Amino acid sequence: MSILLKGGLILYDTSYHPTRADILIEGDKIVEVKRNINKAADEVIDASHSLIIPAFINAHTHSPMVIFRGLAEDVPLMDWLQNYIWPAERKLKRKEVYWGAKLALLEMVHSGISTFVDMYFYMEEVARATLEVGLRGFLGYGMVDLEDEEKRRKEIKETEKLHEFITKLNSKLVKFILAPHAPYTCSLDCLKWVAEKSREWDSLVTIHLAETRDEIKIMEEKYGRSPVEVLKEANLLNDKLIAAHGIWLSKKDLEMLASSNVTIAHCPASNMKLGSGIFPMRDAIDEDINVALGTDGAASNNTLDIIREMRLASLLQKVNTLNPAIVKSEEIFRMATINGAKALKLKAGIIKEGYIADIAVINLKRSHLLPLHNPLATLIFSAKAGDIDTLIVSGRVIMLDGEVLTIDEEKVIDKFLGVGI
């Protein structure tokens, strides 16, 4: 299968210099980017009024939690979890997780997301939804043992079961990831088991880290050390680890994460909404930490719009430091694209020959996007999810002219109309 995108304005390579050109895709790869490509293709897409960008990578979310959008509002994280989310989750059935994931995946398609890192339960259902929609998912069972040996055995069994299930799928798009929930909800024995299996299975790991001051206090009381130091003791600090949030990190913590090549998945909307704190972005970047971007779940965001996430990530740092130059648009865009690809060991996240054909096309015929003096700044500060017109994932057109081609979107929407009040 070949696709030819004609005449688009492209944010090419990592310089993001706007270039008017064509893009030829063969199979799942970008094979040519230049003006006036005259080769035949199975599908030709007119992109003459479009901005063409690498598709986004959502480095931290909980897709089925879209079911709880708006359920718990104006409360801090621990209250949100213990009194609202965890009780509601205990009632969830497999079928509900499947439909919730499908709704979330549709929202991510319209946000221009090709790839997401997901932590939840009943992940076989999320895998099924992911394959049907056609996105790329790194799926992990969220392990929580709370120092209970019997529960730890159950969590290990569930994780092994998911690993076997995804391995047997042998899919290019659905990948396994180990997903211990957090250092304060997982015992040291559980974390050490995860580290061991990460090496044995050559698996990536995702975990919540230093999200709140309460977490820091819990870890100090329990271990006399920071959460980062506990992860080091568990042998989890390495380039396979994607740590979500990373708000309450000391200089020593940042240095340890940097020297271990850990990725931090920054989730500004969730952090702001739950009053968790502000990620020390400049300090992390200056330590040469790979910072990616995540939406977190729609229960705490309350959207999966990663364009809005880029905007919030930039604005939050500017106002917090009273410095409009504290972070550049190029740095923010990298977080949502190539930095996520680096964390996931994917040759993706940029538009360049030889890279995976994960591409989002933005319709520029929108009043809020014109005039176009600076395409990258316009994308971050003016665009929104609904501006994504076409999405290509691994060389396959998932959405064209705003219409999702892989599943019946109306059927999914109808499933949730009337749910709530």
UniProtKB/Swiss-Prot annotation:
Gene3D superfamilies: Metal-dependent hydrolases, Urease, subunit C, domain 1
Residues that hold substrate according to the record: E89, H181, E211, D296
Record's catalysed reaction(s): S-adenosyl-L-homocysteine + H2O + H(+) = S-inosyl-L-homocysteine + NH4(+); S-methyl-5'-thioadenosine + H2O + H(+) = S-methyl-5'-thioinosine + NH4(+)
Major enzyme class: hydrolase
Binding site for Zn(2+): H60, H62, H208, D296
Domain of life: Archaea
Cofactor binding summary note: Binds 1 zinc ion per subunit.
EC number: 3.5.4.28, 3.5.4.31
Keywords from the named record: Hydrolase, Metal-binding, Zinc
Any one GO MF annotation of this record: metal ion binding
Co-factor requirement: Zn(2+)
Keyword set includes Hydrolase: yes
Any one Pfam family match given in the protein's UniProt record, by short name: Amidohydro_1
Family annotation (InterPro entries): Amidohydro-rel (IPR006680), Deaminase_MtaD/DadD (IPR023512), Metal-dep_hydrolase_composite (IPR011059), Metal_Hydrolase (IPR032466), MTA/SAH_deaminase (IPR050287)
NCBIfam families: PRK08393.1 (NF006252)
Family listed: Belongs to the metallo-dependent hydrolases superfamily. MTA/SAH deaminase family.
Function summary: Catalyzes the deamination of 5-methylthioadenosine and S-adenosyl-L-homocysteine into 5-methylthioinosine and S-inosyl-L-homocysteine, respectively. Is also able to deaminate adenosine.
Name of the protein in its database record: 5-methylthioadenosine/S-adenosylhomocysteine deaminase
